[in-house]
From Swiss-Prot:
Interacts with FtsZ via their C-terminal domains. InterPro entries: Cell_div_ZipA, ZipA_FtsZ-bd_C, ZipA_FtsZ-bd_C_sf. Belongs to the ZipA family. Residues 27-333 are cytoplasmic. This is Cell division protein ZipA. Residues 108-119 have a biased composition (Low complexity).
């Protein structure tokens, strides 16, 4: 549909253009047929009349020189005037022909060119300058001048004895070297880290039910696991198995006042014992904690007891991890 519409529009536009062109062509043809019957006019006479008209009423002065050049006009052939049926055109043509026949061609006289006046050159006489003779000056009597005799030896002596030029001493001030003061930037002292509060890791070993640990059997188990009876009447684990060196952890009686009555032997008994590791401690805290846990488990298995936490509850893996986290805080320091 769109293509058909475009084709129709183009065809309509071409038809309108053809109609317009045909109308213009016919109107031109009619006008040319009406105005084509013109009388040939002698353009030479018209031009001559136009040039001669302004000169008829005036007398030209004789001094003016008029030079008329021959103009080469195109020659137009006379055509026969076609007869027209229109009475209006016949009247105009006849009147124009009569008018042109009545007019006479003016005669133009060629004036002889006069010689142009040559400019007069005036000669200017230059003024003559006379020689002025200087006045005669009185002549004075010649005076005899005695020229002094110059001895070169004296000049040489003077040259030799001339004092040497004295060089002026100029005190040049010493330039003082300006040293820029060193800028010392004091580094801020690190703030002291807050001291950690002391902590204590406690592991208890308790007898089964109402069982109690007897004295000799308990003391032998403690000594076999590297514990030594010492200060405060309790057992200690030292850095050296011989009992010398720093204390790593200690074992006390679960019953107050917490010390052991070793001399009593078989008469001594207790429901349980407590292992405790003070923090911070000597050496590696993690290593000391592992050693204390292993020792408590060994003694518990030998005596037939249970390993409990600080609240005397069963020691679970989660509780052991909590102990390890508390120990790591002191290991970083």
């Amino acid at each position: 549909m769109q293509e058909l519409r475009l084709v129709l529009i183009l065809v309509g536009a071409l038809a309108i253009a053809a109609l317009l062109f045909h109308g213009l062509w016919t109107s031109r043809k009619e006008t040319s047929s009406k105005f084509g019957k013109k009388v040939d006019i002698d353009f030479d006479s018209d031009v001559d009349d136009e040039q001669a008209a302004p000169m008829r009423g005036f007398d030209q002065p004789k001094e003016d020189v008029v030079v008329q050049k021959e103009r080469k006009e195109p020659a137009f052939a006379r055509e026969e005037v076609p007869t027209s049926d229109d009475p209006l055109f016949e009247g105009t043509v006849s009147s124009e022909s009569n008018k042109f026949t009545q007019q006479e061609k003016p005669t133009v006289q060629q004036a002889q060119p006069q010689p142009q006046p040559q400019p007069v050159v005036q000669q200017v006489q230059e003024p003559t300058v006379g020689r002025i003779e200087p006045e005669a000056k009185p002549v004075a009597a010649p005076v005899k001048r005695e020229e002094p005799t110059i001895s070169f030896s004296a000049i040489d002596d003077e040259v030799l004895t001339q004092p040497e030029p004295v060089q002026a001493k100029v005190d040049i001030p010493e330039t003082s070297t300006y040293l820029e003061p060193e800028i010392i930037i004091e580094e801020p002292e690190p703030e002291p880290e807050p001291e950690l509060e002391e902590d204590v890791i406690v592991i208890n070993v308790h007898g089964m039910g109402s069982d109690r640990f007897s004295g000799n059997r308990l003391f032998n188990s403690l000594e076999q696991n590297g514990l030594v009876f010492g200060d405060m009447a309790i057992y200690h684990r030292h850095s050296d198995l011989s009992g010398a060196g720093k204390v790593l952890f200690s074992v006390a009686n679960m019953v107050s006042p917490g010390h052991f009555q070793v001399p009593e032997g078989e008469e001594f008994s207790t429901p349980g014992i407590s292992f405790f590791l003070p923090l911070p401690c000597y050496g590696d805290a993690e290593h000391n904690f592992k050693l204390m846990l292993q020792t408590a488990q060994m003694i518990s298995s030998e005596l037939g007891g249970n390993v409990l936490d600080e609240k005397r509850d069963m020691l679970t893996p989660n509780k052991i991890d909590e102990y390890k986290q508390r120990v790591k805080v002191f290991c970083r320091k």
